[in-house]
Amino acid sequence: MHWTLAGNLAEVLAALEAAAASGAEGCVCTELALTGFHRRLPELLDPAALAAAEAQLRAACARLGIAAAVGMPTLGEGGAVFNSHAYIDASGREVGRVHKRGLTASEASFFTPGGARGWTVLGGLLATSVLCREMLDVAALLPELAAVPAGSEGLPRVVFWPSYIGASDAEQAALCRAYVDGAEMLARELGAWVLQSNWPEGLNLPGPQGFGASVVIAPDGRRVAVLPRDAAALQRVDIG
């Protein structure tokens, strides 16, 4: 994570390059990957700079022939700022966004909560996103994810889980376990893969804080992979 838009954009572009080089057809990035999730975020909300960064992401996806789901702020009307996960297809076209609704108290002092979410067809998958602590809200999410777009019933379902969570102490470790329990339940109930992309570090509190350790959960609720803790990593997942 970096304090600047340029630094974080470079990291996302490098991740897309690495994913494409591995033969992947898509890449899932973290919560607010484009800006970083830190106390200087309000300084990075210049509309022109954000638009230029998003244009670079779309161009990279088109050049590499890879789809991406990338966390970024969305600037709305009346000064609203949403914490969003944006979907870009392999032609470089944005095909959807999910705005985080289940905000923490501190997030709610800055971000505007999103509304109901649905599914988006992305790279031959039926995708949606559950952002960070929203994995505690599975009971509320299931009804709005019950319906799928017409004609997409046979596509594999994938829930992207961009996050910024760390098991920094016993209380936070217990909370992280509750998040994963929610993710496993969501996978089973929807028959969907859950792909977490958690930040491997934070800037507000330097040093190891128990970040990373992203999980891959199969549609039957089994945890099939756990990435390294407090370290950046790329995991290829084959979804059929």
Regions from the PLM with identified roles:
Residues G76-R157, P162, E171-D181, I239-G240:
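Active-site catalytic loop in hydrolytic enzyme cores
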Residues M1-H2:
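Generic N-terminal amphipathic, Lys/Arg-enriched alpha-helix
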Residues L50-A69, L136-R229:
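CN hydrolase (nitrilase-like) catalytic-core segments centered on the catalytic cysteine
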Residues V70-M72, S84-Y87, G118-W119, G212-V216, ...:
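Short beta-strand scaffold segments in enzyme catalytic cores
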Residues G102-T104, R229-A233:
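A short acidic/small-residue loop/turn micro-motif
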Residues T112-G114, P208, A231:
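Residues that act as N-cap/strand-start positions at coil-to-secondary-structure junctions
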Residues L5, L9-A90, I165-A192:
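Cys-nucleophile CN-hydrolase/nitrilase-fold catalytic domain and related Cys-dependent amidase chemistry
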